C-alpha cells in the first residue's frame, strides 16, 4: 500500500511497521504491531502525524500512536448477528476515517456491508473485542450478495462514503444514506417480509436516494483502493486490472481520464494531503507520482474505446470438484480404520491425479473466459 505522510507508515504482510527516512536517504523500519493474516490498509487520523489505525484479514482494528510505539486492539469486526450473538469475523481489506470527525471510522472486507463505527464507544481497556457498528452502507441490490466484497473505502470532506467492490462498481453514498446498524441480520432474526420492508422505510430523515455510480474500470484480480482527489474532493480515482489509473467527476460520475500506471495492475492510489500530487502503485516494483503539469489539455477518452492490456499475472480460481471431496473423506475413513500403508500410497497417488485433473479443467475454463475479458477494460 501507499501512504503519504511525514513518516511513511506501511503494512508488510501481516506486520504494521514504520519507516523513517534518514538524511542520507537510508530507510530504517521498526515493528509496531501484527495481524493474524495480511494487513491491507491503514487510516491516518486527519490533522495528526502520529495517530493511525490498521485493519487485517483477522477482522481486527488496531489503534497506533507513534509517540508511544504502542498498539491498542479496539475490536474485531463480526459478520452478522444471530440469536446467540455475533458470528465469525469479517476479513477486512479497507479502513478509512471521516476527515470531519476523527471519531468515525468505516471498515469493509469479505462481505457487501461497509460498517461505520464510533471509536468512542469501543472498549479501550481490552475488556471486550466487541463493537456495535453505528451504521452500515450497501447498494440495495448487493445486500444479500455473497459473491462480492469491499476492496476500498474513502470518506470525502463532506462525510460522503465511497465504496469499491470486487467484480462490481464504485458507489458514493451521502452522509445519511446508511441502512442502520445491522440491516442484513435484522431480517434474518425477525424472519418476515413485513419487518424487512419496515426496516428500509422506518426513518424519513435517512437519504435513500440511489448512490452515484462510477464505471469503466475492472476490479477482479486484486485488492484495489479508491480515493477522492482535488482540493474539495471533486474527483474520484481508482486503479484497474488493465494497468490504468481511472479518474471520474464526483458529482455526476462522468469518466475523465485513464492513465497508464502499471505494466499489469494498478492497486493503490493515495493523494498528497496538501498539494496536488497522487501516488500510485501496483504489480511493478516502483511507486509513481502524478502531478497536473502537462503543457496541453488532455483529450477526454471514451471508456468503451479503451483496449485491455495483456496481463502478466493471473489469479487462479480453484474449486474442489465433488469427486475430489468425496475421495478425501473416503481416504480419511480408511486411515482411521487402520488399513495398510500401501493402500494409503495408492490413495495419495490417485488424489494427486484428481487435483491435477481439476486444475486442468479450471485452466481451460479460465482460458475460455479470456474473450469475454478482452471486450473492454470495464468490469460492468
Predicted regions and their residues:
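Solenoidal tandem-repeat scaffolds enriched in leucines and small polar residues
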Residues: 30-126
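Tandem repeat protein-protein interaction scaffolds
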Residues: 1-8, 12-20, 24-25, 35-43, ...
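Conserved beta-strand position repeated across blades of beta-propeller domains
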Residues: 1, 43-45, 96-98, 154, ...
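Generic preference for well-ordered alpha-helical elements
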Residues: 9-13, 25, 36, 54-57, ...
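Terminal intrinsically disordered, low-complexity extensions flanking WD-repeat/beta-propeller proteins
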Residues: 78-81, 90, 112, 121-161, ...
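Conserved blade-register residue in beta-propeller folds
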Residues: 18-20, 63, 116, 172, ...
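Structural hallmark of WD40 beta-propellers
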Residues: 3-9, 17, 28-30, 48-53, ...
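Conserved strand-to-loop turn within each blade of WD40 beta-propeller repeats
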Residues: 9-13, 21, 54-58, 66, ...
Amino acid at each position: 500500500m501507499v501512504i503519504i505522510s511525514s513518516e511513511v507508515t506501511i503494512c508488510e504482510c501481516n506486520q504494521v511497521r514504520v519507516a523513517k527516512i534518514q538524511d542520507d536517504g537510508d530507510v530504517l523500519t521498526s515493528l509496531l504491531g501484527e495481524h493474524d493474516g495480511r494487513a491491507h490498509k491503514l487510516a491516518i487520523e486527519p490533522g495528526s502525524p502520529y495517530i493511525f489505525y490498521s485493519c487485517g484479514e483477522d477482522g481486527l482494528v488496531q489503534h497506533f500512536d507513534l509517540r508511544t510505539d504502542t498498539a491498542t486492539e479496539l475490536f474485531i469486526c463480526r459478520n452478522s448477528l444471530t440469536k446467540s450473538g455475533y458470528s465469525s469475523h469479517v476479513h477486512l481489506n479497507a479502513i478509512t476515517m471521516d476527515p470531519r470527525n476523527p471519531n468515525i471510522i468505516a471498515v469493509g472486507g469479505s462481505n457487501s456491508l461497509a460498517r461505520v463505527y464510533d471509536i468512542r464507544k469501543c472498549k479501550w481497556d481490552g475488556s471486550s473485542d466487541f463493537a456495535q457498528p453505528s451504521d452500515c452502507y450497501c447498494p440495495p441490490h448487493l445486500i444479500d450478495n455473497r459473491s462480492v466484497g469491499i476492496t476500498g473505502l474513502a470518506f470525502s470532506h463532506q462525510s460522503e462514503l465511497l465504496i469499491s467492490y470486487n467484480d462490481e462498481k464504485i458507489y458514493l453514498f451521502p452522509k445519511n444514506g446508511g441502512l442502520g446498524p445491522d440491516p442484513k441480520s435484522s431480517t434474518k432474526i425477525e424472519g418476515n417480509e413485513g419487518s424487512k420492508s419496515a426496516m428500509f422505510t422506518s426513518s424519513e430523515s435517512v437519504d435513500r436516494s440511489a448512490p452515484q455510480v462510477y464505471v469503466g474500470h475492472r476490479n477482479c484480480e486484486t485488492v484495489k483502493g479508491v480515493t477522492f482527489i482535488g482540493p474539495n474532493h471533486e474527483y474520484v480515482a481508482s486503479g484497474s486490472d488493465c494497468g490504468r489509473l481511472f479518474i471520474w467527476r464526483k458529482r455526476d460520475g462522468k469518466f475523465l481520464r485513464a492513465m497508464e500506471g502499471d505494466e499489469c495492475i494498478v492497486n493503490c492510489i493515495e493523494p498528497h494531503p496538501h498539494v496536488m500530487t497522487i501516488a500510485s502503485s501496483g504489480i511493478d516494483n516502483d511507486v509513481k507520482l502524478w502531478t497536473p503539469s502537462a503543457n496541453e489539455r488532455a483529450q477526454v477518452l471514451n471508456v468503451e474505446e479503451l483496449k485491455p492490456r495483456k496481463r502478466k499475472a493471473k489469479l487462479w480460481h480453484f474449486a474442489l470438484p465433488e469427486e475430489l471431496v468425496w475421495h478425501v473423506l473416503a481416504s480419511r475413513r480408511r486411515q482411521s480404520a487402520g488399513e495398510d500403508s500401501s493402500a494409503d500410497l495408492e490413495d495419495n497417488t490417485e488424489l494427486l491425479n484428481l487435483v491435477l485433473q481439476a486444475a486442468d479443467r479450471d485452466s481451460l475454463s479460465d482460458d475460455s473466459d479470456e474473450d469475454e475479458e478482452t471486450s473492454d477494460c470495464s468490469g460492468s
